[in-house]
């Protein structure tokens, strides 16, 4: 019989085996005939053990051990079964969290979730017409086995079978949930701690064992490892501390508490050894992700005292910190130039070039971005897909280089790359910004088919509606039509889509051709109603609401604009002091006016509603049933600029007064107070410029000039804002007002824009002599 013995009454997987052979005198019962032996069946129940019976006629009985055998075996079997149950619970993944065993049925009424791995190939196949059958697809090679398989022998001997049981083996399918692998390491360390911990183990084996833990899992196991070192009364060596630091620096951001731990570990490392270049590189990377760039100068000073050269990785971390964390474009460019001209070792690679080009595109320096792109190509560096798509997006924003936008996108196909999700989003953005609604709708339809719709893509679709220009008013061709490849691309993809077959219930009108602006207004209203019902979280973005409201501003009337403005946005009153207002309404003496108003209302109600054709009836029902702001976005400065612009365009004085009053309330809110003083002043100046234009469109020139005169010392007025007022004054024959406006422009140009005065220029010419 196989006997299982517990060591010191502690559950462990260290097994001792002994063979006990009973004699024939164990029982007084008559012997039963033993049938011939058969092959053992491998189908056993969990925890069942079938003992072998062996007989020996010459063996003498041991009555003392025989008496204790049944009780000990029962206890040992009970303990073994309970321990096996514990291990099974750790090994068994949760069904609701297992991405391999659970299959969630998609909801066709909602925009589908993104599957980035399959979306790019599917969209590329749909657009290019080269989509292959799934049966002919070659399966991808299996991923490499996870780390942590090679455990030192003395630790493996202490753990027993648990080291092979919990760590995943090399199989054809290693797509195990990440949570399961993390729990394996946690259970492995806890079992090692119960089996004696680190006492008696060599430091080399312990360090080798801990080095096998993946950094993502090590980040959460640091307290347990420190506790094991303390129990064994062993000092933590500096390589282990450095492993802790490397695991804590994973991710895009580092919290202040994590930064305190990192500083503590670096102090422990410095007590055991001198800090080397690797330590300083990781330290600077940690401060960059913690957004404390000001402390980097002190670290660089320490390196200078120790005669440690600044490495290329340190420069790269500093450049990325200025670009993505500090948003300091100029200092990023200065550091980038230092990398190029300092030494050959610090020459920037294609990743640094890509980051700097992205920063130039973000700050609308397209010409500098193109210069860096051609410089990168001259040095023979590789060009990646994200760089080309970013340059295409940047060129579409520039009047000078917008014709090159689609050229960069088609270079992605020239390289033979499958466009990724970012490339498709930039493709949507370029078509939307150009006002090519037909192409934008088709690209979005393809993304619906491949379940790769993002909120950014949805925002670009609404943007295309706001940039739409009717064919009889459009003076320029679409940018894609200026390229021969673009003409073929647009023609083929428009013919390939049938809008009469909706995908996921998305309410595209069944036509690929856009006849007029009413089509755009109607479809945008239907899409907004569909999004309110299925994806209300999309509607809380202010940029999306601004594009939705701009559609009515450019293509609709005042009624449609005000309806969209009120139904899609609201004033966030957080931080606004509550003031009690009392309105006194005095009764009018002329009663016939009431009858006149009622007759006017009857006449207007009898007239047909022109907005009924362009407004979704479902949206009307939703707005009647929804009274809160859960489907609206809080208003910001840009939305108020659009509102005051609409008041001037449609010449609605009461709406302008309403927006002017509400904008004053908005300045008292927390959302406005959280802005920097520079941003607040910039937003106020933009609103003042639109207010001047609004009063000018209503022929209220004195009110417009009063706005300018009241803020002449605060805002840098220029001809860009005052040109409309000056031209209107000239048309109405108000020469004095036009002269006053010109004087304001001259004074502010000298004060804010650095232009020289006329008298100073004459003095300069006289001194110069020519």
From Swiss-Prot:
It comes from the Eukaryota. Keywords: Mitochondrion, mRNA processing, mRNA splicing, Repeat, Transit peptide. Transmembrane segments: none annotated. It is found in: Mitochondrion. Residues 43-53, 588-598 have a biased composition (Basic and acidic residues). The keyword Transferase does not apply. Its main location: mitochondrion. Gene3D superfamilies: Tetratricopeptide repeat domain. Belongs to the CCM1 family. Binds to mitochondrial small subunit 15S rRNA. This is Mitochondrial 15S rRNA processing factor CCM1. It comes from Candida albicans (strain WO-1). The lineage of its organism: Eukaryota, Fungi, Dikarya, Ascomycota, Saccharomycotina.
